[in-house]
Amino acid sequence: RTREEQEFFDSFRIYVVGGTEKWQKKAAEVFPTMHFLGSEKNFDRSALAQADYVIINTNAVSHACTEKAKNAAPKSASIIMTSNNNLHLLQRKLLETIQ
C-alpha cells in the first residue's frame, strides 16, 4: 500500500463486524486504524455511532449481528458487505467505494 493510500484510509473511521477471529487479527495488522467489533451480537451499538464506513464480513457472523450492525450505523455511513477473506481484495473494494 502506498503512503497516499495509507493516509487516505487513516482519514476515515472504518469499523469491521464479522469474519473469524483469525481473519480479524490478520486484518488488524494490515489495517491498524480500523476498528474491529467481533462477530457476536453483543457488541456495543454506540461503537458504530461515528462510523464513516462499516464493513460486514458475512463469514462467521450471525444474521442478527449483521442486522444489528446495519441498524446501529449512522445513516451517513456506507455499509460494505463482503464474504471474501482476501485482504488485498478488501482493500481494493474499499478504495473503489471511497473514491
Indicate where each model-derived feature is located:
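Ser/Thr/Gly-rich flexible loops in soluble cytosolic domains mediating phosphotransfer, phosphorylation
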Residues: 74-99
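Alpha-helix C-terminal capping/helix-to-coil transition sites in glycosyltransferase folds
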Residues: 49-50
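Short glycine-rich, flexible loops that bind phosphorylated cofactors or substrates
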Residues: 62-64
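Glycine-rich, N-terminal phosphate-binding loop of Rossmann-like dinucleotide-binding domains
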Residues: 58
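Short, aromatic/basic amphipathic alpha-helical patches
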Residues: 27-31, 66-73
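Redox- and metal-dependent alpha/beta enzyme cores, enriched for Fe-S-associated oxidoreductases
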Residues: 2-43
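An anionic, turn-rich surface loop/hairpin at beta-sheet edges
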Residues: 39-46, 70, 79-81
